[in-house]
């Protein structure tokens, strides 16, 4: 949720160049089971500048198999009459040495009053996002991943973070198998097989992607390599290329 390139660059979409920084402070504390962090920046907003004030805090508590955390980001741009607050609760659960689950729940609250600088654009939006990732490696050969995410229509963390888009749900899965136990008489040193698959759709259920891919590679004792790839994708919609003017079908 924190993307430091937002700082010192001015607000996106307003044609501003680099903005001077008046104040920057970073404090961190690493304890036996609890970590704390604070990050504060104030940009120059004199003479009609579009500088803003940024704050980010981080709290994380760790036990033997569970890590819980919270992050807050807050941005105020007085020239735009804009305030943006994003809160994130996150979790890492290590069920065993072979299995791990990670996840986040995010909430954004954006408030902007209309004024001449922001082209009389008023914003009052709140929304949620979340994702969860499960990984499992039962042995040295097999590795599995499953990933699910949901980003609400009005979720926005771009004031102090980065996201490609909102209004989508995504599913991704991957299974890989590595083999290194070829006999000495074999010309193969190792092989790897990876099956990946995924789908993305808008929150209204319009398909943005549906695909699968299978890769297999061999590494010879001579260090030569051979790889085969196969995959497929279904027809999909593109809801961004028209810039808000409907959906475009892509085969």
For the regions a protein language model found, what residue spans apply to each?
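Exposed, low-structure sequence patches enriched in small/polar residues
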Residues: 20, 106-251
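A conserved hydrophobic secondary-structure block that centers on an alpha-helix together
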Residues: 10, 14-90
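Extended aliphatic helical segments
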Residues: 19, 40-41, 59, 75, ...
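Extended, well-ordered alpha-helical scaffold/bundle regions in very large, multi-domain proteins
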Residues: 79, 84, 91-94, 98-117, ...
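Acidic glycine/proline-rich low-complexity segments
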Residues: 1-6
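Outer-membrane beta-barrel proteins
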Residues: 31-33, 61-65, 76, 89, ...
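Beta-sheet entry/capping signal
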Residues: 24-26, 35-37, 67-70, 88, ...
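Hydrophobic side chains in beta-strands
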Residues: 25-29, 40, 61, 72, ...
